[in-house]
């Protein structure tokens, strides 16, 4: 290349870089200046091979001690790179020290041993609450200048912890089943003590680059109370051999100056997430998540392309999210919190985002999952069985107003959504609506327009909603909300059928001579047959038509909006025993055809017999119970 061409090439590159830089925000430029510097997390050249310290890559021999000796030797020498010959290394908790690079090269697998005794209990934060908990597989604890790199794999080996949590298949047992029966579903995530693959805690100047994490027992990559962390090119694959509960992808928790980019996430909860503590304990700590950029990532299975919350207590500010692509994630941009979380979430900017086949592209629920979010210790649990962490979890927020989260000053621009179910959803509080939300250059294709409750001051500039209904977004207790431009889709709609009345539905089901039980959801105007799915209702009516044995199951939402759980209804003992097995409390009314008035009904809250109709009416409030007709 001659000098003229070389000069021109340099000039073009400089111009391109200059244009690119001008378009970037001040926050992005500042973080790039930190993380793209050659001096960031610079490690000495010395190399330390784990094989020299006795590590065996056979996937059977526990190698924790040998790998840790290698890391410690590197740290004692002033720093260096720890390397692995190809193979699978079975390990417990490892602690990477300052000035050390853990290089997990291609062909290397570090696999978590399925034994909680191999993970020492440390002070940490779990799902927004500070407590002692098992260490992660790979830990950076109170360190600085650390790298974890390479094309290898960190295998959380999580199936053991998934089954411990909710059984196999899911929702068939485990601690989840035991705890929900006791009325403490909210405690199981903490007490199950599922080991995380990677935790960065109270550390600074950390690089996580290019490795794959799979089968996480709990949250996959957790960055807590840390500063200047760069996550680049990390792949997460948690839906291998099952579906790990709460297997978030990359979580930034009360940390600052964070850049997450070029990642590819497939998990079974929030794909990319930002958190800041939970409830009274999170408000006590009061550490925000701030100065954070998530960009140029792909998300696949999961429950949130990018989620803010539900742990919002310490607040969040100065966050930019862009260049993301969601492929099949069931929620896109997601806010979640609760009336005991508190926190101010402000100055957030989402832009240049694509979503395809995402059911709920914009889902802002600030009264999220009540069965999990509002922790109350039942009176029937003996005092000696109550754990200290339960007391922390159930501590009241005072004054109560402090627990109301506030989301404000949020901008969403240059976003394209294809094939969604519901375009917009928001639900906040009258005391603090979701307010000052600004939309610009947004295009959404959805079957339904959506609904906003307690929102104010939303502006929409060049926002197009192609809606299957052609209806505006429903507004309830809202002020100063601009509607998008709405175009009804031209796709042919199925011929609208008249909705059957409940009596007609019951009559249709009752034509089947074998039918014994008909549950009815009055809220959804729905008579239920075996296998049906319904929405939640406080009240459920159950008709028992004959004195015969029968059983059926239907499904209702668990509470987070995306998992559905069975409700089992059974009649046995020739109609004398009625059993309900469920996980959510309802007020049940049973109408039981009976030719003779029973002497008593064990388990009922109240009951009466109609001689003319030869029918018993039974009232019972509960989740799982048995009624015995004597």
Feature annotation, model-predicted:
Residues 1-5:
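Positively charged n-region of N-terminal signal peptides that target proteins for export
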Residues 6-15:
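Sec-dependent N-terminal signal peptides
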Residues 15, 20-498:
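Extracellular/periplasmic carbohydrate-active domains that bind, remodel
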Residues 116, 600-620:
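Solvent-exposed beta-strand/loop surfaces of large extracellular or lumenal domains
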Residues 148, 590-605:
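Solvent-exposed beta-hairpin/edge-strand motifs
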Residues 359-361, 421-423, 539, 587-589, ...:
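Exposed beta-strand and adjacent loop surfaces of beta-rich binding modules
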Residues 493-495, 499-595:
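Catalytic core of carbohydrate-active enzymes
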Residues 619-630:
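Surface-exposed interaction regions enriched in Ser/Thr/Asp/Glu
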């Amino acid at each position: 290349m001659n000098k003229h061409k070389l000069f021109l090439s340099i000039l073009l590159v400089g111009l391109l870089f200059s244009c690119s830089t001008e378009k970037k925000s001040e926050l992005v430029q500042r973080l790039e200046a930190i993380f793209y510097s050659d001096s960031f997390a610079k490690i000495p050249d010395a190399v330390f091979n784990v094989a020299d310290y006795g590590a065996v890559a056979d996937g059977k021999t526990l190698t924790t001690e040998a790998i840790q000796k290698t890391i410690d030797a590197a740290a004692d020498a002033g720093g260096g790179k720890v390397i692995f010959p190809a193979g699978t290394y079975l390990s417990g908790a490892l602690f990477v020290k300052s000035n050390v690079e853990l290089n997990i090269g291609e062909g290397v697998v570090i696999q978590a041993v399925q034994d909680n005794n191999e993970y020492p209990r440390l002070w940490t934060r779990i799902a927004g609450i500070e407590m002692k908990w098992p260490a992660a597989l790979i830990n950076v604890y109170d360190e600085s200048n650390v790298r974890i790199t390479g094309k290898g794999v960190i295998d959380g080996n999580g199936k053991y912890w998934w089954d411990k949590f909710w059984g196999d298949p899911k929702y068939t047992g485990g601690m989840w089943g035991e705890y929900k029966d006791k009325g403490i579903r909210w405690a199981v995530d903490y007490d199950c003590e599922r080991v995380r693959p990677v935790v960065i805690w109270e550390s600074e100047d950390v690089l996580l680059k290019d490795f794959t994490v799979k089968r996480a027992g709990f949250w996959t990559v957790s960055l807590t109370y840390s500063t200047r962390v760069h996550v680049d090119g990390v792949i997460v694959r948690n839906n291998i051999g099952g579906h790990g509960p709460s297997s978030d992808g990359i979580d930034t928790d009360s940390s600052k100056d964070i850049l997450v980019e070029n990642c590819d996430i497939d998990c079974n909860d929030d794909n990319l997430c930002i958190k800041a503590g939970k409830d009274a304990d999170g408000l006590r700590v009061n550490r925000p998540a701030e100065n954070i950029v998530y960009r140029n990532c792909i998300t696949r299975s999961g429950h949130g392309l990018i989620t803010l919350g539900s742990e919002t207590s310490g607040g969040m500010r100065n966050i930019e999210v862009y260049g993301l692509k969601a492929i099949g994630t069931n929620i896109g941009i997601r806010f979640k919190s609760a009336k005991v979380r508190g926190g101010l979430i402000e100055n957030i900017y989402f832009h240049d985002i694509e979503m395809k086949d995402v059911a709920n592209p914009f889902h802002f629920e600030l009264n999220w999952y009540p069965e999990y979010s509002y922790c109350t210790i039942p009176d029937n649990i003996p005092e000696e069985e109550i754990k200290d962490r339960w007391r922390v979890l159930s501590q009241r927020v005072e004054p109560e107003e402090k627990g109301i989260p506030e989301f404000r000053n949020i901008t969403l621009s240059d976003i394209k959504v294809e094939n969604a179910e519901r375009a917009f959803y928001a639900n906040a509080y009258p005391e603090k609506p979701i307010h000052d939300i600004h939309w610009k250059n947004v295009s959404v294709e959805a079957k339904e327009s959506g609904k906003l409750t307690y929102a104010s001051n939303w502006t929409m500039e060049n926002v197009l909603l192609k809606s299957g209904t052609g209806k505006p977004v429903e507004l309830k207790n809202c002020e100063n909300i601009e509607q998008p431009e709405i175009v009804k889709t031209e796709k042919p709609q199925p011929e609208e059928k008249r909705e059957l009345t409940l009596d007609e539905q019951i009559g249709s089901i009752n034509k089947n001579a074998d039918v014994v039980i008909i549950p009815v959801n009055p809220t959804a105007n729905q008579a239920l047959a075996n296998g049906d799915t319904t929405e939640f209702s406080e009240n459920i009516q159950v008709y028992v038509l004959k004195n015969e044995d029968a059983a059926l199951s239907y499904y209702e939402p668990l509470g987070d909006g995306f998992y559905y759980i069975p409700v089992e209804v059974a009649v046995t003992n020739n109609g004398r025993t009625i059993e309900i097995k469920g996980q959510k409390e309802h007020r049940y009314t049973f109408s039981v055809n009976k030719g003779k008035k029973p002497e008593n009904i064990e388990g009922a809250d109240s009951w009466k017999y109609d001689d003319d109709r030869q029918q018993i009416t039974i009232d019972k409030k509960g989740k799982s119970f048995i009624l015995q007709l004597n």
